């Protein structure tokens, strides 16, 4: 039997059975879930109603993540799935779905921050910079350019919880796209109250 999105197979509110009024129709069809896993990218194309195409992601390992407070978006590697409000099984099997909480690589965001503000981020005190990083941060600049960066640095504050994550090189993010429909796992970096909430949830889950 095919997956059907009809409602006449359900019982009445009184508990009585309904007689089937017709056979299944094409416009009532449903498809099996994509259950997108972490791994080298694999996307299938699915023809849908009206000749449109859906991008069924079966495996993904990267996504575009937005750092809201800095208005910056970077492509980053997805490392792990750590929390899912709807189902713990989806965490165990590392399934990427909308609103899954994932761990992403912090490097692209750190590189952007350091080149934008010319300030180190998420580094131990006294840690040596590589030649390339040193060339970006300590490069000799004109007076006008230096003034521009000084003005930026006044607004360069990063909240402590996020800075701690930069020290570990991993950031918590939330998937905002639907990988089984659009073939992408894009989302945003968790900040503020939302970050606090999910850190609490993850901590209590580990304590069990």
Swiss-Prot record:
Q: Where is this region: Disordered?
A: 1-34
**Superkingdom classification of source:** Eukaryota
Q: InterPro entries, from UniProt?
A: Ribosomal_eS8, Ribosomal_eS8_CS, Ribosomal_protein_eS8_euk, Ribosomal_Se8/biogenesis_NSA2
Question: Which controlled-vocabulary keywords does the entry list?
Answer: Cytoplasm, Lipoprotein, Membrane, Nucleus, Ribonucleoprotein, Ribosomal protein
Q: Principal place where this protein is found?
A: cytoplasm
Cytoplasm: is it a keyword of this entry?
yes
Q: Where does this protein reside within or beyond the cell?
A: Cytoplasm; Membrane; Nucleus, Nucleolus
Family (UniProt): Belongs to the eukaryotic ribosomal protein eS8 family.
The record's NCBIfam families line, in alphabetical order, gives: eS8
Job description of the protein:
Component of the small ribosomal subunit. The ribosome is a large ribonucleoprotein complex responsible for the synthesis of proteins in the cell. Part of the small subunit (SSU) processome, first precursor of the small eukaryotic ribosomal subunit. During the assembly of the SSU processome in the nucleolus, many ribosome biogenesis factors, an RNA chaperone and ribosomal proteins associate with the nascent pre-rRNA and work in concert to generate RNA folding, modifications, rearrangements and cleavage as well as targeted degradation of pre-ribosomal RNA by the RNA exosome.
Q: Please give the name of this protein.
A: Small ribosomal subunit protein eS8
Species annotation? Spodoptera frugiperda (Fall armyworm)
What broad taxonomic lineage does this protein's source fall under? Eukaryota, Metazoa, Ecdysozoa, Arthropoda, Hexapoda
What gene makes this protein? RpS8
């Amino acid at each position: 039997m095919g997956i059907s999105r009809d409602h006449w197979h359900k019982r009445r509110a009184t508990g009585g059975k309904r007689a089937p009024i017709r056979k299944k129709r094409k416009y009532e069809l449903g498809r099996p879930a994509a259950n997108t896993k972490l791994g080298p990218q694999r996307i299938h194309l699915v023809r849908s109603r009206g000749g449109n195409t859906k991008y069924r992601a079966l495996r993904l390992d990267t996504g575009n993540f937005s750092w809201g407070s800095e208005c910056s978006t970077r492509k980053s590697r997805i490392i792990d799935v750590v929390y899912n409000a709807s189902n713990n099984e989806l965490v165990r099997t590392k399934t990427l779905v909308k609103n899954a909480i994932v761990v992403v690589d912090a490097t692209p965001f750190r590189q952007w921050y350091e080149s934008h503000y010319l300030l180190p981020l998420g580094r131990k005190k006294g840690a040596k910079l590589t030649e390339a990083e040193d060339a970006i941060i300590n490069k000799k600049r004109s007076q006008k350019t230096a003034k521009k960066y000084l003005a930026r640095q006044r607004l360069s504050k990063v909240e402590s919880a996020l800075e701690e994550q930069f020290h570990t090189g991993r950031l918590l993010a939330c998937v905002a796209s639907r990988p089984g429909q659009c073939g992408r796992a894009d989302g945003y970096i968790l900040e503020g109250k939302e970050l606090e909430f999910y850190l609490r949830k993850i901590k209590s889950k580990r304590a069990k």
